[in-house]
């Protein structure tokens, strides 16, 4: 009987279930969107029970449509939107409030207060993160402070906190396991990434009772088994978990120090494996745990770019320059260059290495000869310039030069962008055969835990190249183009 690994990819707008075989190939997949709630400007929330319902639905769809039986599933891996926060009642299993999403800015006031009290360095040194509404810690505090009766219940040990992985494992196991993995714990602003434990001082500052927190386990580990009433009468090992970006790093087989990947989604997330060293950044990068595996923890440096694929959507929907995103490549290739035009797509501020939330999008270098093609090309090029900003910061912090960049996400199908990215970084850019690297990473972590795959060496051998883009640009040209980008960013930041 052939067996498979089931990967649950719980994202910001949809939940997916993907069935992988021994070769790491996709056998079947299903996807279901769920509701986004915006109770106030800048706030983003999800209904945690609706997320759970969407996960059950995609699992059922995959099993029924693929024609397999549940006992052919050797294990389940979970990857999830990171930082999104659920607080629920231990006895009833009901969330006390909506899940507060990573994008939500509703804890800005709490963060401002913590920074004013001088806690920035304390959090940075212990967690590798910045005090920002992005991370879970202030979201938990907000729920305890704003939901009637929540703080009292939490202090009595009746409430549980979890990121989405914890919530799903708790639900799948029928409440038997309240756990998370190292990668997700490292995004909470409450976990000491050096001592590998919840930090009492940080919990005290945030006013979060320790009894709420999940147990932290390796990313490849049998956490629990599914309860039969949720899983076609079967008890299947839930055996792997990792935050989405760390999972993509694993799925890209970036197992050696200095290997890196860039995911081109709505925004971009670039991660570099720094091995067993947690490197503190001087250039606006986050220090994070990549995964816990084989009795050790590995770390990564992470850079966040807020606008990537959404800039192409803006050209399509806002500027109406084309009807299909694929056309952006055709238009960009009709001209030899952007003709001195630079687009700084700071629609929601700039992330790494600038961390400036007040700067807004700008266009520079327009002349009477500027065409639609130049404008589209300049917008695509801005994705690559931002990735170079991040990579330069990573190399400066780590002292490691990247040898190749592995890429995934929607925009990697754009050959023009990938070639320009390689030219600008002066390293080969590698696009894998399987683009679903986030779901694949979770499948691999689960598969190793249940013996479906032997180890990371076997997984590295399965990584297959679709296309490699090699740098063709001369140094002088690269320096000239990137110099123009830096001038454009500085000008945009001055215009407030």
From Swiss-Prot:
UniProt PTM comment: The phosphoenolpyruvate-dependent sugar phosphotransferase system (PTS), including enzyme I, and histidine-containing protein (HPr) are required for the phosphorylation, which leads to the activation of the enzyme.
Which sites bind sn-glycerol 3-phosphate?
12, 82-83, 134, 244
Pathway recorded for this protein: Polyol metabolism; glycerol degradation via glycerol kinase pathway; sn-glycerol 3-phosphate from glycerol: step 1/1
Q: Which residues are ATP-binding?
A: 12-14, 266, 309, 313, 410
InterPro entries in UniProt: ATPase_NBD (IPR043129), Carb_kinase_FGGY (IPR000577), Carb_kinase_FGGY_CS (IPR018483), FGGY_C (IPR018485), FGGY_N (IPR018484), Glycerol_kin (IPR005999)
Please state what class of enzyme this protein is: transferase
> Which positions are annotated as binding ADP?
12, 16, 266, 309, 410, 414
**Activity regulation behaviour:** Activated by phosphorylation and inhibited by fructose 1,6-bisphosphate (FBP).
Q: Which SUPFAM superfamilies match?
A: Actin-like ATPase domain
Write out the catalysed reaction.
glycerol + ATP = sn-glycerol 3-phosphate + ADP + H(+)
Give EC number(s), comma-separated: 2.7.1.30
Residues recorded as bearing Phosphohistidine in the entry: 230
Q: Does the keyword Nucleotide-binding apply?
A: yes
Q: Which residues bind glycerol?
A: 82-83, 134, 244-245
Q: Which UniProt keywords apply?
A: ATP-binding, Glycerol metabolism, Kinase, Nucleotide-binding, Phosphoprotein, Transferase
What GO CC annotations are associated with the protein?
cytosol
The answer to keyword Nucleotide-binding applying to this record is yes
A single GO molecular-function term is: glycerol kinase activity
Output the GO biological process annotations, alphabetical, semicolon-separated.
Answer: glycerol catabolic process; glycerol metabolic process; glycerol-3-phosphate metabolic process
Q: Which NCBIfam families match?
A: glycerol_kin, PRK00047.1
Relate the protein's function as given in its record.
Key enzyme in the regulation of glycerol uptake and metabolism. Catalyzes the phosphorylation of glycerol to yield sn-glycerol 3-phosphate.
Q: Which family does it belong to?
A: Belongs to the FGGY kinase family.
Describe, as the record does, how this protein assembles with itself and its partners.
Answer: Homotetramer and homodimer (in equilibrium).
Name recorded for this polypeptide: Glycerol kinase
The protein's gene is named glpK
């Amino acid at each position: 009987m052939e067996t498979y690994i089931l990967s649950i990819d719980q994202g910001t707008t949809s939940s997916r279930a993907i069935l992988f075989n021994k070769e790491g190939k996709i056998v079947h997949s299903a996807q279901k969107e769920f509701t986004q709630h915006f109770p106030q400007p800048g706030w983003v929330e999800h209904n945690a029970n609706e997320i759970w319902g969407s996960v059950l639905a995609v699992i059922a769809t995959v099993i029924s449509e693929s024609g397999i039986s549940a006992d052919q599933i050797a294990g389940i891996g979970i990857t999830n939107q990171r930082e999104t926060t659920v607080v629920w009642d231990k006895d009833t299993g009901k969330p006390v409030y909506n899940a507060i999403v990573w994008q939500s800015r509703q804890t800005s006031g709490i963060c401002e207060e913590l920074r004013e009290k001088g806690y920035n360095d304390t959090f940075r040194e212990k967690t590798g993160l910045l005090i920002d509404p992005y991370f879970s810690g202030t979201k938990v505090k907000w729920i305890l402070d704003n939901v009637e009766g929540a703080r009292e219940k939490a202090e009595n040990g009746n409430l549980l906190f979890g990121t989405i992985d914890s919530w799903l494992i708790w639900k799948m196991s029928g409440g038997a396991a309240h756990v998370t993995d190292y990668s997700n714990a490292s995004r909470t602003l409450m976990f000491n990434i050096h001592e590998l434990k919840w930090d009492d001082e940080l919990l005290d500052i945030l006013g979060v009772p320790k009894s709420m927190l999940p147990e932290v386990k390796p990313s490849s580990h049998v956490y629990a088994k599914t309860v039969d009433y949720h899983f076609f009468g079967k008890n299947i090992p839930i055996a792997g978990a990792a935050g989405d970006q760390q999972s993509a790093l694993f799925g890209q087989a970036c197992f050696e120090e200095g290997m890196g990947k860039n995911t081109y989604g709505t925004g971009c997330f670039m991660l570099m494996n720094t091995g067993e060293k947690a490197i503190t950044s001087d250039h606006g990068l986050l220090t994070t745990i990549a995964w816990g595996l084989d009795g050790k923890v590995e770390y990564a440096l992470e850079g966040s770019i807020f606008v990537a694929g959404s800039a192409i959507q803006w050209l399509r929907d806002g500027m109406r320059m084309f009807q299909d995103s694929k056309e952006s490549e055709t238009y960009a290739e009709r001209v030899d260059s952007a003709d001195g035009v630079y687009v700084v797509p700071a629609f929601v501020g700039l992330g790494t290495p600038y961390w400036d939330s007040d700067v807004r999008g700008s266009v520079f270098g327009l002349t009477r000869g500027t065409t639609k093609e130049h404008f589209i090309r300049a917008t695509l090029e801005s994705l690559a310039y931002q990735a170079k900003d991040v990579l330069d910061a990573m190399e400066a912090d780590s002292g490691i030069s990247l040898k190749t960049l592995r890429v995934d996400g929607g925009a990697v199908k754009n050959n023009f962008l990938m070639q320009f990215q390689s030219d600008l970084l002066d390293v080969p850019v590698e696009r894998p055969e399987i683009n679903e690297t986030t779901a694949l990473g979770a499948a691999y972590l689960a598969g190793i835990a249940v013996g479906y795959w032997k180890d990371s060496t076997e997984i590295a051998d399965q990584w297959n190249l679709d296309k490699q883009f090699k740098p063709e640009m001369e140094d002088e040209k690269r320096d000239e183009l990137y110099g123009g980008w830096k001038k454009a960013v500085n000008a945009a930041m001055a215009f407030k």
